[in-house]
């Protein structure tokens, strides 16, 4: 089960998109060729990047657009990888998808990256990388959550009660309403679920960067 985020200063969360991949009513891309494979299989969204140098992404549009405050969270399991590479979430881009935001973790090391970049990687507008500790060493299951609340992004991994990174919304400008998964060469993953929720903050929230306390975490596992 996906972990719930800390709820300090949050009055209500309203689910606007949720998929457990029991079917493909949502219309995720399905494909199989010499470069990639993507399919709904055994209540998971399976994604394989067979190339040696080209990243892949699998995405859809949030029909009514992202609200002012929102959270995206997902559970992803890495099945195999060759060499090094990253996988995770992409969001905030349009159909031409020239510029994207991503929140990804490394396949071979306990590291993560948050960045805004051009599709061809010729230019990176914002980038931050850091390390983290898995709650269960050796586990192949990864829990990622990204939240935008009153102009600040918060990024969570696994059971951390505190975000691994915080930045102002201006660093990760949104170009559109598409979101989905990112997979680099040689990596095979499957997603168990993904959820997007609208967040309503409590009256009087002062909009400053908020650092949640450990006691405010609700573990949804």
Give the location of each predicted region.
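Extracellular carbohydrate-recognition regions
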Residues: 2-32, 202-220
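Beta-strand-rich interaction surfaces with strong enrichment in secreted/lumenal proteins
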Residues: 6, 57-65, 129-136, 168-169, ...
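Extracellular beta-strand elements of beta-rich domains used
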Residues: 21, 191-199
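Carbohydrate-binding surfaces in secreted/extracellular proteins
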Residues: 21, 74, 136-169
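Short carbohydrate-recognition loop motifs
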Residues: 36-56
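Secretory/extracellular carbohydrate-interaction modules
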Residues: 49-119
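Short, aromatic/His-centered strand-loop micro-motif at the edge of beta-sheets
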Residues: 120-145
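Flexible glycan-contacting loops in extracellular carbohydrate-active proteins
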Residues: 165-192
């Amino acid at each position: 089960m996906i972990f719930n985020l800390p709820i300090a200063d949050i009055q209500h969360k309203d689910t606007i998109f949720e998929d457990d991949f029991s079917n493909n009513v949502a219309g995720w891309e399905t494909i199989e060729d010499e470069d990639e494979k993507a399919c709904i299989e055994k209540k998971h969204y399976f994604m394989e990047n067979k190339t040696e140098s080209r990243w892949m992404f699998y995405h859809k549009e949030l029909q009514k657009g992202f609200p002012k405050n929102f959270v995206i969270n997902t559970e992803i399991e890495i099945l195999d990888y060759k060499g090094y590479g990253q996988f995770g979430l992409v969001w905030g881009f349009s159909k031409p998808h020239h510029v994207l935001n991503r929140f990804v973790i490394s396949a071979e090391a306990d590291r993560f990256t948050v960045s805004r970049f051009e599709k061809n990687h010729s230019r990176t507008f914002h980038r931050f990388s850091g390390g983290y500790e898995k709650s269960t060493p050796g586990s192949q299951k990864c829990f990622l959550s990204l939240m935008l609340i009153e102009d600040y992004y918060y990024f969570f991994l696994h059971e951390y009660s505190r975000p691994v990174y915080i930045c102002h919304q201006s660093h990760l400008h949104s170009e559109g309403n598409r979101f989905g998964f990112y997979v680099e060469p040689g990596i095979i993953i499957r997603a168990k679920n993904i959820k997007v929720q609208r967040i309503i903050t409590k009256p009087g929230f002062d909009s400053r960067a908020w650092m949640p306390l450990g006691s405010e975490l609700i573990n949804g596992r």
